[in-house]
């Protein structure tokens, strides 16, 4: 078993870190640069920085903030939000991002995945997929979960892998912000469907939820926001608990 990763997510709106429940009712969870530094020092394996206003308001990701965050931390760092071209990615990588995450733009223009993988290598291309169950079937949603599609989660995951994505960041819209645990059945099915790493997102509330995502969901990494931002779970404590649960983790 490869070492599992713990990834705090910084949702950014207007230059501040925010976190809502089910993608609505955003609360201010602080300064992104300070939070990034805190997480790096506490032992986070990676960070994800999503400019959640970028796609919706057609605003490009906050380049200055990316630069400041990258100057502050020494762990891998993924940036998403408003990315729709090879040029967008080039700018982000030049300003310190290690990887980029694309979501709505990949669904609207799947060829973008091929183009980015060709230009920069699969290792820095993460495709984020937001999905929820509609009549028992997992369907992909766009624009922060606001727009439903007819696309099947597992078909889309296979396609993004075939097009060159290096990783999938899967958020269950049904679980996001609820703190009731990750979508482990869907995660397990995803891990059987594709051979690239899966990052689990949506539903973290307890340390056991992280263990379940790895042991039941076969996730390669687990991402969370509010439990870290509001210090309900400390990363170091979480990692020790996971290690005690026979999960391979970097302490």
UniProtKB/Swiss-Prot annotation:
Record's GO cellular component terms: cytoplasm
This enzyme's EC code(s): 4.3.2.10
Active site residues according to the UniProt entry: 11, 130
InterPro entries the UniProt entry points to: Aldolase_TIM, His_biosynth, HisF, IGPS_HisA/HisF, RibuloseP-bd_barrel
Compartment annotation: Cytoplasm
GO BP terms, alphabetized: L-histidine biosynthetic process
Highest taxon of the lineage: Bacteria
Record flagged with keyword Amino-acid biosynthesis: yes
Predominant location category: cytoplasm
Matching SUPFAM superfamilies: Ribulose-phoshate binding barrel
Pathway(s) annotated for this protein in UniProt: Amino-acid biosynthesis; L-histidine biosynthesis; L-histidine from 5-phospho-alpha-D-ribose 1-diphosphate: step 5/9
Sorted UniProt keywords: Amino-acid biosynthesis, Cytoplasm, Histidine biosynthesis, Lyase
Catalysed reaction, written as an equation: 5-[(5-phospho-1-deoxy-D-ribulos-1-ylimino)methylamino]-1-(5-phospho-beta-D-ribosyl)imidazole-4-carboxamide + L-glutamine = D-erythro-1-(imidazol-4-yl)glycerol 3-phosphate + 5-amino-1-(5-phospho-beta-D-ribosyl)imidazole-4-carboxamide + L-glutamate + H(+)
Any one Gene Ontology molecular-function term assigned to this protein's record: imidazoleglycerol-phosphate synthase activity
Record text on subunit structure and interactions: Heterodimer of HisH and HisF.
Family: Belongs to the HisA/HisF family.
Function: IGPS catalyzes the conversion of PRFAR and glutamine to IGP, AICAR and glutamate. The HisF subunit catalyzes the cyclization activity that produces IGP and AICAR from PRFAR using the ammonia provided by the HisH subunit.
Descriptive protein name: Imidazole glycerol phosphate synthase subunit HisF
Organism: Flavobacterium psychrophilum (strain ATCC 49511 / DSM 21280 / CIP 103535 / JIP02/86)
